[in-house]
Amino acid sequence: MKELRLQASAERLEDVQEFVRGKLEAAGGSLKVMSQVEIAVEEIYVNIVHYAYPSGDGEAAIRCETDREVPKITIQFLDAGTPFDPLAKEDADISLSAEERSIGGLGILMVKKLMDEVTYCYEEGKNILTIVKYL
């Protein structure tokens, strides 16, 4: 699995997007799949930037792998920030109006809808969120 390590900062979002885009292009991902993956990658990475390290700077790692036998891309997001399982929270109720709905949860709901698989684990002091999209 190829890995990109970087300071978790908003300024590095484009580096993350380019890293994943390169893998998708090499694997022959369609424009639709590329757009869906880019949205999910942005949402997850921005959440790491904003919430993983409340006391300051921290590092993030993005691992990316494509599989030609079963055409898919697997992307892992790792950080050593505050332990947080975004999948443990109940999905946002999108049938409610914006005023009635509690704040938060729409981004991870969007990721779950766009990706084919989304899993989370906390191992060796790291949050590991894995997304899979079939090509």
Feature locations, PLM:
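Glycine-rich phosphate-binding loop
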Residues: 100-115
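Conserved polar catalytic motif of the HATPase_c/GHKL fold
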Residues: 42-47, 113
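Conserved short strand/loop->alpha-helix "switch" segment adjacent to the catalytic nucleotide/phosphoryl-transfer site
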Residues: 20-42, 100-102
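Glycine-rich/acidic phosphate-handling loop/turn and adjacent ATP-lid/helix
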Residues: 72-103
